[in-house]
Amino acid sequence: MCLRKGETKMQDKNINSQGPKDFKNALKRFWLSIREWKIKIIVAAVLSLISTLLMVFGPMILGMMTTSATESLKNQSVINWSEINFLAFVLIATFLLSAVIGYIQGVVTSSLSVLYEKKLRNSILEKMRRLPIGYFDKTPNGDVMSRMINDVDMISVSFAETLTQIITSFTTLVGYLVIMLYLSVTLSLIAIFAVPISTIFISSVLKKAKVYFAAERTTLGKLNSIIEENFSGQLIIKANNHAEKSIKGFDKINDQLYNESRQAQFLSSLTFPLTHVFLNLAYAGVCMLGGYYVISGVISIGGIQAFIQYLNRFNRPITEVAQLSSTIQQILAAAERIFNFLEEVEEKPEVEKSLFKQIMNKDRKFLGEVEFRNVNFSYDVKPIIKNFSVKIKPGMQVAIVGPTGAGKTTIVNLLMRFFDPNEGEILIDGVETSKMRRDEVRDLFGMVLQDTWLFSGTIMENLKYGAKRVSDEEVYKAAKLVGVDHFIKSLPNGYQTVISEDSDNISAGEKQLMTITRAVISEPLMMILDEATSNVDTRTEQLIQDAFSKLTKGRTSFVIAHRLSTIREADLILVMREGNIIEQGNHKELLAKNGFYAELYNSQFSEDV
């Protein structure tokens, strides 16, 4: 969980709406991502090739059986059953062997598909860990979820089938063509003539379909974002009578997805009938000329039977190849979205040699002195923090106040290294945080956020989240210290009570008390409290304040609060406006100045009265 800026989350403007911009590059990146399994791919390809070739000879063997029988009848002799039985045995053996090899090939490609799916999901999750928080501020959650779920599923489901189908279709097509040319060059030319004509028509159709398929994937990501936001924000939607407007917004995107899907499927579905029309014309021509050739003795009846079977099946691999084109486009469109995500700019690399040990040396005590030295920070091009400097002594409780957008939360984001300053330095016990690893800096702090995050699981599991080797007894002790132990024990299953997915079976105040308990358990060296009492009742607020006072005792701590009554006991209050510290001092000193802080405090006091 991390702190967010106050800015509104922006829509991702870089989502590709036209499919793979560079087909060759997308294909190259796709190959580079799967080449670690090239041995499996080669094995699957060889097995598919053998299985297909065995099936290709089926009509030829049937033709030989027909020729043997008709020649015997033509010569008014006894049918050579031994030859026919032998050919029948060869035919059955061929089909069985092809089926067994095909099964083995299917197992290999399925395992390859599962491995690749696992790799993609792991890569996306690892990438998320390395991305700066700013990326998630600008990118809708649903879009990232769409890449991890929908796009990965598209590749996983289609990849194995497509790999097999490509090999099978091309092998079948080439095998049929070679045997057809062997049986009759003239008849083969009639069949082949239909291919380029149908290809021209189909290519133009698929070119248009590609655009709709890519747009469909993009719109699906937007729809996921809307669904996720509507689902998690139902309480706010209903409280503000916003349901009808939300439905209209959903319907608009849903209709857009419907139209794009309909257009994509309509154009994609044209490939089969178009191919069928041209190949059926060729089929009619072959039947007419083939009949003449049989009568003329140019080709045997078994030969023309085999040729017609090949021709009858000839359209299948061509149709499959045509349909594969659209499937490949979908795969590459999904793959490109994933690869683009994996190539997003990451956080700056960690320092090779961390200076963390300098402040955690066994020979010296950790103090908790924090200094901001001439810090400047801009979010995109908007300046947020301007030449910010302050030195905080060990053990001080520092409150940061100011209007929305003043830069309060950004200060904490910089302190936790969720962002790094554009200029200036942040030091802890005299060591620059930029010269420590991010996880080392974050280990120094315990955080209690306004947006309390509890996952679906037991209360005990939630309280132990992030802690290392904590016993149940330590959890009980921390809960008693915070004052939440009585509440937990009053639940049906106590500490083993399962919190629902949205943790809506406990109140906001109880959630915050639990997050404070979690912080107590982690025994942090310093503390951060971000507006954690701004949406609870007065009694719970007092419980939280008491718990926080115990937690911050002797620790350097930072408090961000809009309710200024909660930070009257702070050692130092920093008053911010437009990224600058305009006032600082304790509560009494700032009131005596009768400045901006006094104005804020008195206005809130008047509202409370």
Feature roles, as predicted:
Residues 128, 250, 338, 372:
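Conserved catalytic Walker-motif region of ABC-type ATPase nucleotide-binding domains
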Residues 23-38, 144:
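A short amphipathic helical element positioned immediately N-terminal to and/or at the very start
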Residues 16-19, 23, 46-47, 54-67, ...:
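Juxtamembrane helix-loop junctions of ABC transporter transmembrane domains
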Residues 31, 35-39, 133-134, 152-159, ...:
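An intracellular "coupling" helix at the cytosolic face of ABC transporter transmembrane type-1 domains
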Residues 71-75, 179-193, 263-337, 341-342:
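Helix-loop-helix
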Residues 2-5, 356-609:
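ABC-type nucleotide-binding domain
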Residues 35, 46, 101, 113, ...:
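Hydrophobic alpha-helical transmembrane segments of ABC transporter permease domains
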Residues 3-4, 41-101, 182-186, 297-301:
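Transmembrane helix-loop-helix hairpins at lipid-water interfaces of multipass membrane proteins
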